[in-house]
Design a protein with these regions (language model features):
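Catalytic cores of large soluble enzymes that bind and process phosphate-bearing ligands
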Residues: 4, 20-24, 28, 107-111, ...
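Active-site metal-coordination/substrate-binding segment of hydrolases
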Residues: 61-137, 141-143, 148-159
Length: 219
């Protein structure tokens, strides 16, 4: 029989075969919706492209608290200089050496393809004993969070939520980092240059990732 690891790999490779750059998740969004329908699972695809999939609890656990598994379907796409690659149409070529996965000349998309594939594998596992499960796959996590921003709060009706986008294998992070983005406009008119120009620089500060280094209280 197919093991969970084999099913996980199969699902991940199926995602790699679909271009899913941020802001261009139409194909993978439809794929996930169709996949759920074929599995006999209740699925919703909202106007933003988010996909919400529900699986009832296993026998005897239908009334247990619901657990949400959340992952994002977009990826950051980069490729080697000089490589002929179209991120909107070309697929990721995965290299598996038996120990690790990497992509040929491009980013792999493990963030967060691994999370999406894991949720898919859990949803189709008929041997597991579980309460109701809801998978929420959002778009545009890497560049704006528009998927999460436009998600109808009614889909968050659950006692537990597990985000499948953590950085360390075999560990859990009981926390969350957030961010705000603003776009400001001001009308301006050009003036003839005059006077002296000065350059002011603020440097030598120590920064860090807003999520991974937030506890260090850096500048």
């Amino acid at each position: 029989s197919t093991t969970m690891n084999e099913k996980l790999m199969e699902n991940f490779l199926s995602l790699c075969a679909i271009p899913h750059k941020s802001h261009h998740e139409e194909k993978i969004s439809r794929f996930l919706y169709d996949w759920a329908v074929k599995k006999g699972l209740a699925a919703v695809r909202d106007e933003e492209g988010n996909v919400i999939i529900d699986k009832p609890g296993s026998a005897g656990h239908e009334d247990a608290p619901r657990t949400i598994l959340q992952a994002h379907m977009d990826m950051v796409v980069v490729w080697e200089d000089g490589m002929d690659f179209d991120p909107l149409n070309d697929t990721i070529t995965v290299i598996n050496d038996g120990k690790t996965l990497k992509a040929k000349g491009t980013s792999l998309g493990g963030d967060d393809g691994a999370g999406v594939a894991l949720a898919m594998s859990i949803l189709e596992d008929e041997s597991a004993v579980h309460g109701p499960i809801r998978a929420i796959f959002t778009v545009d996590e890497e560049d704006g969070m528009s998927g999460a921003d436009h998600l109808d709060p009614k889909h968050l009706d659950a006692k537990y939520l597990i985000n499948l986008d953590w950085e360390e294998f075999g560990s859990l992070c009981n926390s969350s980092a957030g961010s705000d983005m603003y776009r400001m406009h001001r009308a301006a008119e050009w003036e003839a240059a005059s006077g002296k120009a000065y350059k002011i620089a603020v440097s030598g500060l120590v920064g860090g990732h807003s999520g991974a280094s937030i506890h260090l209280k850096l500048a």
